Amino acid sequence: MSDGFDRAPGAGRGRSRGLGRGGGGPEGGGFPNGAGPAERARHQPPQPKAPGFLQPPPLRQPRTTPPPGAQCEVPASPQRPSRPGALPEQTRPLRAPPSSQDKIPQQNSESAMAKPQVVVAPVLMSKLSVNAPEFYPSGYSSSYTESYEDGCEDYPTLSEYVQDFLNHLTEQPGSFETEIEQFAETLNGCVTTDDALQELVELIYQQATSIPNFSYMGARLCNYLSHHLTISPQSGNFRQLLLQRCRTEYEVKDQAAKGDEVTRKRFHAFVLFLGELYLNLEIKGTNGQVTRADILQVGLRELLNALFSNPMDDNLICAVKLLKLTGSVLEDAWKEKGKMDMEEIIQRIENVVLDANCSRDVKQMLLKLVELRSSNWGRVHATSTYREATPENDPNYFMNEPTFYTSDGVPFTAADPDYQEKYQELLEREDFFPDYEENGTDLSGAGDPYLDDIDDEMDPEIEEAYEKFCLESERKRKQ
């Protein structure tokens, strides 16, 4: 009976189960032979207590390893009075240890050692291939340089290739210099008939007149192609076909200036494009000189007459834009020929301001244009010919030169003939060593003037005076 009291409750119940809750199961941490807590305490050496908490005993591994992926069930221990808050004991599945490929360390000499089992991972067959086509995400568009490397061969028609290039220049005008040469070479290989050349001219003209910001870029493109396209059919080369297309629009100028709003808007775009062509289209003479197209000069004069003859606000605004763009060049060209066309245009502007029923803002624009022309179109010319200053022709030649001092304190300048060599030497030293004063004293001390920094902090007196100045300025500002 005393043995029953000496033995802890439940100590013998786990003897035959191996994995009981009160015995040597992983949760209990007891001996394999079913010894109770009292007997276990006598056999184990005293363990030092961890500060603040009790360290639980280590969990031992199961005696046998279940098959990979299998679960084993542990029967519940006999019913015992449940503790308050304790969960009811049920059959609990136990998972295999995570490192089932390793050998299980021996915990009990009496238990048989199970053979280690190796889990073979299933082999996944990949569908990837080195010969698969290149992957592009949805919405990806190839860059311009890639799409134009092979020329127009990747496009169904020549018009699609040219239109794509024009749209690209509209969005990225800075790429003109780097890509125009390749574009011209491609056109030389694709444009081989009269119809293809006529289609090219029409595409460029429509782009330049339908998109306002493309008129300047379109004029530059026309100038480049007029010099680099080699095709010259019986109907005319690129420049001749371009001028013929502009003449077609020019011949209906009077009707367009009187037309509806849509017609006038299209006519104004043509006028500004013709002005850009006059400035950018270069014609090389027989002796290599570069001139402008005189036929465009005559056309611009007649277009101005058509605009001022129909003094509506949008017509007058278009005339102002054209004169701001080409006024100085037109006036110089007319003066060389002894013509007074610009004087006549200015007189017509003054008459419009006095008599026409245009808006106040448009009249103000016309007056600003007259003022701009009176200031020579904003150009500034030197009043006298530049001459290099010398001691002979400039009395103030030595005024801004620095003054140096000898070791005796005698000042000398570049005008002193006795010290010219010494003066030049000091000037050269000052250029290479800016930390030197006029008398050759090194401001930065004995160190390297290139490496040593000059202490630029203010003196206490200067700092105090500066603070007073700031306070005084703040006081005056608040008054």
UniProtKB/Swiss-Prot annotation:
GO CC field: cytoplasm; cytosol; mCRD-mediated mRNA stability complex
Residues annotated with Omega-N-methylarginine modification: 21
MIF4G domain: residues covered: 159-376
Major place of residence: cytoplasm
Domain of life per record: Eukaryota
Localisation per UniProt entry: Cytoplasm
Pfam family, one: MIF4G
Location of region: Disordered: 1-114, 435-455
Spans annotated as PABPC1-interacting motif-1 (PAM1): 440-479
GO molecular function, one term: RNA binding
Assembly information from the UniProt record: Interacts with the RRM1-RRM2 and C-terminus regions of PABPC1 in a 1:1 stoichiometry. Interacts with EIF4A. (Microbial infection) Interacts (via PAIP1M) with human SARS coronaviruses SARS-COV and SARS-COV-2 NSP3 protein (via SARS-unique domain); the interaction increases binding affinity with PABPC1.
Protein name, as recorded: Polyadenylate-binding protein-interacting protein 1
